[in-house]
């Protein structure tokens, strides 16, 4: 199955998400919703390598842009907006795909946003963090 692109509403704005189906069903393995890091976007080399690695194991991945990247910016959105964007993409995944199991996460800042959603009680079957920042940028503790 070919990748499927969606426009996802985030408040009054929209962003792009791409679902790349795996070869195994979500009853066997979860779908992974993967957010990019601060310096990247959903189509950068590290994100595409992540998607390939999951596909080698038959796992479907949804990748998306945060709003600032969708607009071509370089300064990340506020953490509440990053979390809202992630939640909106997950809601769209649930509407479109009805996954049996769903894991949220991402690279660096994207993983941080997903972990903060999970800490707030956001419903997901798992949390996967890649290159997770242990502290905010510019601070060592």
PLM-predicted stretches and their roles:
Residues 5-101:
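Serine-hydrolase catalytic machinery in alpha/beta-hydrolase-like enzymes
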Residues 1-2:
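Basic/polar N-terminal segments that are highly enriched at the extreme N-terminus
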């Amino acid at each position: 199955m070919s990748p499927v692109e969606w426009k996802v509403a985030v408040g009054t704005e929209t962003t792009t998400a791409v679902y790349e189906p795996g070869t195994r069903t979500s009853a066997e393995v979860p779908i992974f919703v993967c957010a990019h890091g601060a310096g990247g976007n959903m189509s950068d080399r590290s994100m595409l390598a992540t998607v390939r690695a999951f596909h080698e194991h038959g796992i479907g991945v949804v990748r998306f842009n945060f709003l600032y990247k969708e607009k071509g910016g370089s300064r990340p959105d506020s953490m509440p907006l990053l979390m809202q964007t992630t939640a909106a993409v997950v809601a769209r995944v649930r509407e479109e795909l009805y996954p049996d199991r769903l894991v949220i996460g991402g690279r660096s800042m994207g993983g941080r946003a997903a972990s903060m959603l999970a800490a707030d009680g956001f419903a997901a079957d798992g949390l996967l963090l890649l290159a997770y920042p242990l502290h905010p940028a510019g601070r060592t503790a």
